[in-house]
Amino acid sequence: MSQYLQGQTAIVTGGMRGIGLAIAQRLHAAGAQVVIWDLAVDDWDAAENGFEPVLRQAVDVSSLASVEAAFAQALARLGQVQILVNNAGINGPVVASWEYPPEAWDKVIAIDLNGVFYCCRTAIPHMRERGYGRIVNIASMAGKDGVQYICAYSAAKAGVIAFTKAAAKELAQDGVLLNCVAPAMVETPLMAEMTAEHIAASKAKIPMGRFLKAEEIANMVSWIAGPECSFTTGFVFDLSGGRATY
């Protein structure tokens, strides 16, 4: 595999499992030294996962103080960060909007939307100073379509898309590119939070008739995070199996 990310440092939030782990593995394979951010980072099996991150940090992305402290520590240790992948997220409960628990709403927004803002807010000044950066935010088809019974998740991911577009315009001449990926449903441990009915309904929307693989997201993210993606910013890359209509 081409080492087109050789010499670059990438932070992947929520990188201990699922989509985040697949992204971390793919960036490492492309030559990047990878920093893993997650709530708990001790349970890492280098043999099973195929590599050892250059740094693993316990970070709560819903806390600006936690994000800022971790980023400062990463810079002190590594000197530079060229790539940020905002992947950390939760689904929240599957329930009608008028019955949605306010505390669950707040938690989903805090992690899935505020977390993206906090990480970008912290990393962007460093990238601007260096005149180079690649930020990839993991959104969702739910953020484009709005999916019934997951109103908080849909709202948060729509916010991620809008934030990405706004910030990308601000940074368009600074060498820092922001894009996001909008996957259809992926087979990951997060499915445990969903009902069988919700899973079946989601699959029925995908013309290809299957769920997305985490590795397919990782392949897309790896290209967006690389130097060959040089004239695209503020864009939403769909991974929908034919579901996307705009």
Regions of interest found by a model, annotated:
Residues 125, 169-173:
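Alpha-helical segment proximal to the catalytic Tyr-Lys
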Residues 172, 177, 232-234:
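Short, small/polar-rich loop/turn modules that mediate ligand/substrate recognition or access, typified
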Residues 2, 91-94, 145, 222, ...:
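Short C-terminal tail/terminal secondary-structure segment
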